[in-house]
Structure formats: structure tokens, C-alpha cells
């Protein structure tokens, strides 16, 4: 669907790895996409690790639920509603969102708030390039995003685990930062359902839950928007949620993490020795200036 919407050709889909049918549903490959020069050269997580160990509560709360229930996420047709403090709001079909943009592969570290991490090659384009098309005005201080609301099909939304629809937000300067990615694929393939098809954020210096999946709404707002995890547990999940080894979660330390990558077999890394977590997930040189003068303990 993504490739058709973007007007790109389809390639052969073989991975050489036997996967559950729902993982293989990613299907089409991206051809001839550029490689971003800033990608990390750290050992990547495997496709299986990245698509079978997921947090996507709309599809279930266990790590294996999203891949099992990925076919419950209906992605055709797909539209994104854009509104708030901008000149060109409206309801946009997926193809209208994607067609002007050139995709590239970026290999980013992903740090979960649960103290595990991965390294994933994403396919996408800078979020800033999309947001500028909507011409936000001077009152647009934040950008609010919402995930699809479809309790008839999505098993997790039948229960009040979180405030539905899932909502996230960024300051406008965070959203416009060159590292912030609108992703449409991973490992050279379209995003599967469990990874947030067809459109998700990747904000590599923040904990993973800030990288909202299956986006259907983008809203430019003047005041800090409410976010689902912060509403659910404000002492545990702040608005910023920058990766910070010096600020512990109330129930565990954030100083170290366990890395799931190709050096480990399957998910054995979850029981391996932990590694030190880097400030801003290793992207401090690029993003620390966004928070100059801000108390990162208070604004966690």
C-alpha cells in the first residue's frame, strides 16, 4: 500500500528467514532508496526481533500480541486529519501525504522506557518536510498526534488500559528537528501492522512510546497537549520522556539497558549483561541544545 501510494515500484519480498504469516504481511520491498549518512553502524536487531517483540497496546498488552493480532489493523483506506494552528489543514489521503517525499533508510537506536533497546533500519522522511507543507502559524508551539481509534477491530481498545485514542505530542522545535522521522517502513519493507502501519513517528532520542504508531491525526496547538501515558501515570511518564540515564523511572533504573541485536539469538539478549545507557540515547550532540536551561529532572 505504501509503495503504491508513493508511486514507487515493487520488488521481490524474500528475506531468507522463516517468519509467522503475520510478520511476512509486510510484503513489498522498497527499491533504490538512499542511505542516510548519519546512520549508526552498531549491530542491528534482527527483523524477527523488531517485528515480534513490540509494545502496541491497541493490539494487546503482551509483547507477542501485536504480531498475532496485526491483521486486525485495517489500513486501507487510510487518511490523516490535519488541523489546528495551520493554514492548510484538512483530511488527506495517505497517497497525498506521501507522494511529494523521497524516502531514505536511517538506522537509529531505539530505547524503550522498559530498559531494553534495539537498532532498527527505518524507511521514511523527515517529519519537518511534511509539517511545513501544512504551513503552521506562529501560535503552533506543539504538535499533537493521535493513533487510529477502532475498538470494533483492535482488541486492546476494548479495554480501558489507556485513554483511547492513543495520543502523543512534541514541541514544534522537536517535531521540526532533522532527526525526527516519519516512518513508512523498516528493513527495506513496508511497516507491518505490529510496527505501526502505515505511518508512525520515530524520535530516536526519546523513549519508544513517544514514537506514536498508526497516525490518523496531526494537530498544531498552542499549549502542551495531553499524552496518553502521562495522563495514565503522570509520576512515571513525563511529557518530554527524553532518554536520560540520570533520571530513574519510579520503579526501575534507567542507567542501563539490554540490547536486542543480531549478536544475540532470538530474544536471549533480554537475559544478557546490560550496557550503559547514553544521554539522549546517544544523540546528545544533535539535540541537547533543544533543552538548554531546562531542568531535565523536573521536565522528565
Where are these regions (language model features)?
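N-terminal export signals
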Residues: 1-22
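Structured, non-membrane catalytic/scaffold regions adjacent to prosthetic-group chemistry
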Residues: 26-300
